[in-house]
Amino acid sequence: MNTKFPEAYVNFLLESNGGTPEEDLAFDFIDIASNKKNSTDIREFYIFYPEGESSYDDIIKVNYIMKSEGLVPEECLVFADDSAGNPICMKTGGENQERIFLCDHELENANNGYLLMSKVADSFNEFIEKLYIIE
């Protein structure tokens, strides 16, 4: 994975390297399909495993599969998912760099064939700030 990550995401990885949040977390976003406010949770942040180790939540494996199947653009880093299986990604290049998107695994963008992407935040820091504990 030859990608330059934003400093906020690098710091997050150094502190936690992903995994399941200790508390049930959610965030709000505007659903691009309905143009209405919606919310979802964080099931898991994907993990960077040491070379030779892997699991279903291996960030390198997940990104390889998502990109080779044409589900997300090459300049997206899928770094988490929600409990419905919707990937959460960050643009790491090109237009909208560093923005965070929720990808609807059931809907396809008719223009490019990728999963339909709803903007969540303009940066990883903003994304983290938008998270709240589910009561």
What are these regions (language model features)?
Residues M1-A84, Y132-E135:
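A surface-exposed partner-binding patch
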Residues E95-I100:
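A short alpha->loop->secondary-structure connector
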Residues A80-D81, T92, D104:
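Pocket-edge structural micro-motifs
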Residues F5, Y9-F12, N63, F101, ...:
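Aromatic side chains
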Residues N86-G93:
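Broad, structure-driven detector of short, well-ordered beta-strand segments within folded domains
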Residues D104-Y132:
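Compact, glycine/acidic-enriched structural inserts
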